[in-house]
Structure formats: C-alpha cells, structure tokens
Design a protein with these regions (language model features):
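Beta-propeller domain segments
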Residues: 33, 37, 72, 98-100, ...
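Blade-level signature of beta-propeller repeat domains, shared across WD40, Kelch, NHL, RCC1
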Residues: 497-523
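A short helix->beta-strand "capping" segment at the edge of beta-propeller domains
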Residues: 33-52, 172-175, 477-489
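Beta-strand-rich domains and repeat architectures in extracellular enzymes and scaffolds
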Residues: 46-71, 413-420
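Blade-loop segments of beta-propeller domains
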Residues: 83-105
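Surface loop/turn motifs at the tips and blade-to-blade linkers of beta-strand repeat domains
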Residues: 46-52, 88-95, 179-181, 201-202, ...
Length: 523
C-alpha cells in the first residue's frame, strides 16, 4: 500500500497522541481503554505489551510463541505472557516497510526444527555521487546480526530474503537461504530517461513478507511489487503508454522481464528445502526458457499482485487466501489458485469496475500532491477505459488465469493481517471464519472484521443485500459504508498478525500498541 510504516506512524502521531521514541523504536499509544468486541459473549485480554513494533508470531507450544519485532530484527520468545529470551537478533534494514517481516514453522515442527523468516538485510549505502546503484548485489548468505538501520539506501539490490533457521529449544541458528529478492528502490535515476520519475524519492515499501505453509507442505511467500513496472505488473512491454508496444526498460537495472531485479509482485511456492516444486503452474514454461527469467517463473504460484500484508491457509479446505492493497481504489480479498493473475496494474478490484478504478485514481489526492500510482513512470491516466481493454493488456503466461477478487472495497480501507479461526472456542458460529485486520487505525481506532465463507469454502458469504456483488461501495477512504455487518471489534490499532492459538482462542498483534491480544469466549 502507499503508506509506508513510517508514514503510518506520522499519521498516528497526529490522530492518536502517540509518542515515538527513536532510541528504542518504541511506539506508545494514548490509552483509550483498549480494544473491544461487539459480541457480548467475547472478551479481550492483553497477553503481553510494551513490545517494539511486533509484526508476526508463531506458536511453539501452549502459552509459548516466537514473536517478531519488525524494527529491531529480534525474535522474542514469549512464555506465559512475558519475554522469556531473545532467540535471534538479526541486523535488519527497517526503513519504511522493510525489516523482520514474516515467520512460518515447518509443518513437522518440532520434529523438524525448521523456522523460516522473511527479512530485509543491510548493505553499504551508495555514495552521494552515484546514489542510484547499490554497492552490493546481495548480502552474504550468513546473516548479519545485531545493529539495525533505517537508512533507506543501505541495502543491496537483492536485500529481501527468506532463510531457514533451526530451533534447538532455546535459540535459532542459521541453516540456509532459500531466496533473495529485490529491496533497493531509488527510481529517480535518469536511466532510462524521460519516464517522469526523475524526481521520485527513494522508497522501501511493497515488500510483502508474509509466509505460510500450505496443506501440501509447500512454503508460500508473499512478495509485493517493490515499485516495479514490468511484465509481472501486467505491462508486457514495460512502462509504455498501455504496457504494449515496443519494449522499454523498466528502470536503470533493465527489465521488464522478471529477472532477479524485476522478480516482484508474486506469490512464490517452494519446497521446504528451498527447491522448486515441479508441479508449480509455470514450472515447465520456465524450464523451457533455460535462463534466469525462466528459473524465476518456475517459482511463481500467482502474479499481478500490488502488495499484501495478509495471507492465510483455510484450515478446512486447504485453499490459500490473501488480501491485496489498492492505491486509492479497491482493496481486495482473494482466493488464490495456481497460476492466478491478480491483474495489477491494469486491474484492481473487479474487472467490470475498471472505469471506477481509473476515475478514483485520476482524481484522488489521498495524502499526495497529485494523482499517481506511487511510481510516477506509469500514471493513472494510462489506466484502460473499459474492462475489455484492460483485460486485453494483461501479461499472459501460458496456464495463467485472471481472477476477480472474492471481495473488495471501492475506496481503500487498508486491510492488513488475515487469519482463519481453526476452532470452536469462540462459539461454533465462528469456526472457520476469516478475520481481517487493518493497517491504519481508522476508522474506529482500528477495526477487526470477520467473514463467513460459503459451504464450498470458495466464496465470501454475505447477509447484507448491499454486498451481493461482493463490493463494499464505501463513500471515501477509510470509511465503512456497506461494511457494518462485517465489524466484530474495534480499537485494535494496526493489526499485523492473526493466529489461532493452541487453546483455540484468537490472537491478534497490534503493531502501534505494541501488544498481543487474546480474544476469548467469556460467557
């Protein structure tokens, strides 16, 4: 999404009387009495507070979980509601949306002690005389530990990575790297020239970072577009007027083909050891290419993704779901199937709503000085005028399929973490429901939504007749019209993870409140 975590915290400073402590990276929120649930049978307790930018968690036992702190690079072990120990301290670049972002345990844990982490490593900042080219291509395989940085240019080209660590009962030790992905974003370089982005600031967002193991034993990795405008963003020829026509480079590193520097906006599917499953949707296609681009395509499960902070596996069906953040228009909830093309940048929201997508993006000044799609080299005026035109522009890989979202919001409401409740502990009516948190504390101080799925677990069930089209036509940004029936809680702040605990209760991480909450049945 457009807002980096830094910008989010600035908004919070104004809106919620928050003090940011640079020396510790801690965020403290003015007390409002804490979050509440609309169902009187449900209650909330704080499991642990005073955490530093908590972002993700994984249970390793009853009342025992590993918790990631985005800005410190620390993996904290929390036992019985207190930090027991720091089991790993990575030296991260936490500028913008970078940092220590995602965790997944091997499906055979703890017999198989694998713990997988998505994080952003550090690099040497480029000299002021040549700021558009990073000093290093990638970090060393062995992770750097200790001190962190928020220097937005202090990253190698491929500074986002997924590594496997081993849990020995008290600490995490590095095992091996699975994949290294783009991190460096400084698109103000006049190479290629005259794309309109010469004055664009450096960025560090759209890194995705969510990890999940599927019922198939494969590791799914969410990686955002990192601001690229190439083939995996449905610009087959790069950032030309329509994305079609003579091929042009995406940036100073080349493109638009998905080589290592442009391999973004995807959900990857890997074996637990980091190798590529031969049943991936584009495995044969990539093998026939026999080059770097082909090797990357072999790893792809889905593409055309803008960015996402939420991905989860339905415990009942095994289906993969995600949320996708729009720019100003059409946040999404998606059922992700093999070979899915989610449509970005040509389409966001349902394809039939493309005219509304274009209207919103060309007229909105949502925290911006002028309408844009964040990367200035492909502006919103280039969006197609009709659904048919948008569909005709898509980058089509053999075996891919465009898919409309299962649910969307007309104006951005900024969903973040998603998670399924895999128990009846809150009551049978909530078993298997999808819970959705948000990445800004507006409206209602940070709402918590929940969705029922249909009997076949492939669609969103709705009770409100206004939602029969599975689009909430809210009136403006961060406004809840047509979402009233989805609301189940409020005042959670920025929700970065939602998990079912070993006791069956729902656990929710609030980044800005520095707290892990537990939702339980009280009556």
């Amino acid at each position: 999404m457009r807002r980096t975590w830094v910008v989010i915290l600035c908004i919070l400073l104004l809106a919620l009387t928050i003090d940011f402590h640079p020396r510790t990276n801690k965020v403290t929120r003015a007390q409002t009495g804490g979050p509440t649930m609309l169902d009187p049978n449900l209650a909330i307790r704080a499991v642990i507070g005073d955490l530093v930018t908590p972002i993700a968690m994984a249970f390793i036992g009853p009342n025992d979980f590993l918790l990631l702190e985005k800005n410190t690079g620390k993996v904290q072990r929390v036992v019985n509601g207190a930090v027991h120990s720091t089991v790993l301290d990575l030296g991260v670049n936490f500028a913008s949306e970078r940092g220590l972002l995602g965790i997944a345990l091997h499906p055979g844990f703890p017999t198989n002690p694998g713990v997988y982490l998505f994080w952003s490593c550090q690099g040497t900042p480029p000299p002021e005389s040549n700021p558009f080219f990073p000093v290093e291509q990638e970090c060393a395989d062995t992770p750097q530990l200790g001190a962190d940085t928020d220097n937005i240019l202090a990253v190698p080209l491929l500074g986002n990575r997924v590594d496997r660590f081993l849990w020995n009962g008290s600490t995490l030790t590095f095992d091996h790297n699975l994949v290294k992905l783009l991190s460096f974003q400084n698109d103000g370089a006049p190479v290629p020239p005259n794309q309109g982005d010469e004055t664009q600031p450096p960025r560090g967002n759209h890194d995705g970072g969510v990890l999940a193991f599927g019922h198939d034993g494969k590791l799914y990795i969410m990686f955002g577009d990192a601001g690229r405008r190439g083939q995996l963003q449905n610009l087959p020829s790069g950032p030309t007027l329509t994305g079609l026509g003579p091929t042009v480079p995406d940036d100073q590193f080349g493109g638009p083909q998905p080589d290592d520097a442009h391999f973004t906006g995807v959900i990857l599917r890997l074996n637990a050891d980091g190798t590529t499953p031969t049943d991936n949707p584009f495995f044969a296609l990539g093998a026939a290419m026999n080059n770097e681009v082909g090797t990357n395509l072999q790893k792809v499960f889905a593409y055309g993704v803008r960015n996402s902070f939420g991905m989860a596996v339905d415990p009942l069906s095994g289906n993969l779901w995600d949320q996708e953040n729009g720019e100003d228009a059409f946040d999404e909830i998606n059922l992700v199937e093999p070979g899915m093309n989610s449509g970005w940048i040509q389409i966001i929201g349902p394809a039939e709503r493309v005219p509304e997508y274009k209207l919103i993006e060309t007229t909105a000044l949502h925290h911006e000085d002028f309408p844009n799609l964040q990367q200035f080299r492909w502006g919103p005026e280039r969006i197609a005028d009709t659904p048919q035109e948008a569909l005709s522009r898509l980058f089509v890989l053999a075996g891919s399929r465009y898919s409309d979202p299962e649910f969307s919001w007309k104006h951005v409401l900024a969903p973040a973490a998603i998670g399924f409740l895999n128990s009846r502990a809150l009551g049978p009516q909530y078993f298997g429901d999808l819970f959705v948190g948000f990445s800004v504390p507006e409206p209602l101080g940070g709402p918590l939504f929940h969705f029922n799925l249909t009997g076949n677990r492939r669609k969103i069930g709705v009770d409100d007749p206004r939602l029969e089209d599975r689009v909430a036509d809210n009136l403006t940004f961060h406004e809840m019209t047509e979402s009233e029936s989805l609301l189940i809680g409020r005042d959670f702040g920025i929700i970065t993870d939602i998990k079912t605990g070993p006791n069956g209760n729902l656990f929710v991480i609030s980044l800005d409140q520095g707290t892990v909450y537990e939702i339980f049945r009280s009556k």
